[in-house]
């Protein structure tokens, strides 16, 4: 997958679980890399030094994640394979504290591909409607109203997803028997 890069504003960095030196570095560009070993790594682009502890999610990530286009400290990343942790799914991660705010897509009964639920694509977020758009290899396009609440002054961030629309699409790889 592709790494993500972000130069966080000082106010945002102050609320993050970054190492103190990273919070203080004015020109820090943080590289965020979800890897095949189940970890998400956080690095200084200039030096390669870790900016915070890695986040273990326990799934293989082989596609590109996405950062929220509004500058909110949110990462959207989907697992590319099942693991000992369960069936592959999408993670919505709070980058202030590296907590998982929401997951979806695993074992979706709406899928044409049974329990297969890989998510190698990168997410889109419609900033105007606060809607996450995420295609899955399970043959479902997810449109999820996030109801994001972000207060940079207080350093708080949450999502309360509702109004989930699932659009089923058909193709060579969307049915169990045809792949």
Set out the residue ranges of the language-model regions.
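Noncatalytic, solvent-exposed loop/strand surfaces
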Residues: 1-179
